[in-house]
Amino acid sequence: DCGIVCVMSGDFVQRGDFAVVGKRARAAAAVRSGADLVLELPLPWAVASAEEFAFGAVYALAASGVVDWLAFGSECGETKLLDGLAAALLDERFPALLREELRVGDSFAAARQRAAARLSPDAQLLESPNNILGVEYCKSLRRLGSSVRPLAFPRRGSQHDSLDCRTRFPSASAVRFLLREGKRAQALDLMAPVMADAFRNEEAAGRAPVFREGCERAILARLRSMSRDDFAALDLGREGVGNRLWQARGEPSLERVLERAKTKRYPLARLRRMILWAYLGVLPGEWAHPLYLRPLAANRTGRLLLARMRSAELPVLTKAAQVRKLPDSSRRLFSLETRAADLFALAYPNLAASLAGDEWRAGPVML
């Protein structure tokens, strides 16, 4: 027997969007489904590129001091292949090869795959999104010199982003699509029973489903109030994507902003994340790594793990007030996360449920 520790995005997610259901309800559902402890991936890493998303998650789990294996799903399910490709991407020759391929003018993903193919026979694995994340998890473990060992297992069911609802395990995209289309009953049938119950409870409380459209005018207002320099600050690579968003900021809907700004080199997911950074006040690269661990839900075994985490490399915040004893950088990160939670609440279907300050009142769900 072993404890199962999960790390999970909070109210905003890596695809550059609002989570349909709030983080504590999802974390509690995860514990009811077999996890023992769920930790929150702090906001700057939850809404980052695959590389930074993976690094934040791996850093948090490694810093907990209670994790020996890092298990994750991928399309190929072969740990050795994914880890070998991670080693190729960390090869000292790779950055120069990538720059050479980027000059062709293709997307970053295509250029990276071609550069990787010059060092590894398995570069085609980078065509699949969960293989990409798996490679990034392995890369992060190698970068950190961690003793945690990776363990890939094959994904089952629909492919990432598939809208096919006829499979036994449909994608989350399919469920979100049905909810957006008002097909609630069909969406609930596709959810795991525990998650369906959590959704119904949040729905009854006026807190679900949450969609970006609930805050669309506020997001557009934020974009229109930003200067060209503000947009440039979101573009770490200085590739011009910030300027494209600045030029598109006056469009009357977020879909129109995205449609005008996107190119082959700047995919929609990246643009959605940048818009979310603008709305929430996230500055990419402001923090090198997570600064604290924050549990969202736990059962009895999870509470025992939390007791062992008193000697973790990062402070564990079971109460929000504990952050006041941490350094200024940690307090600034927590302040960013509390503001983001307040903005998320404004997208609730029932505005009366969107009282600000919940992050200071709510602790982990103990089951």
Q: In which residue ranges do the predicted regions lie?
A:
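A glycine-rich helix N-cap at a beta->alpha junction
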Residues: A28-P42
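Glycine-rich phosphate/pyrophosphate-binding loops
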Residues: G10-F12, L39, W45
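Short, high-confidence coil segments that cap the C-terminus of an alpha-helix
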Residues: C2, A35, V66-V67
